Amino acid sequence: MSSMISKDTALAGAWIVALASSLAVLYIGEVLGQAPCNLCWFQRAFMFPLAVVLGLGLWWQDYGVGRYGVALALGGAAIALWHLGLYTGILPERIQPCTATGPSCTDDNQVFLGLPIPLLSLIAFGLIAILSIFSLKAQRT
């Protein structure tokens, strides 16, 4: 499949997903006023740099930046997967990292557009990782 997509397209796609995800969480937090839980903060720590790093790599046509995209996306995906496990109840609540005074990692506020935010995050990180790999493997146009 990587022969069907160019380095430019793959890197641009990864950057668009990272940028859209970053803007979406800012919208959820700043416009909708929903405070992020602890796990959301950690996912943001992986997503925000992706928008910058992949954007600069695209601007400078540095396709090697895809390796940083893969690393950051896999780190964020691991946290999103853990978050999704807590949200769905697969992981026991006793290992829940959220504090008693802050927002919950598992309540109904963790839904956006009818889908759990941890699932949306996992999908975004997965797409970024796949597209970043394609940007490393694909032919240049």
Where do the PLM segments sit?
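Secretory/periplasmic and organellar redox-cofactor proteins
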Residues: M1-L39, F46-T141
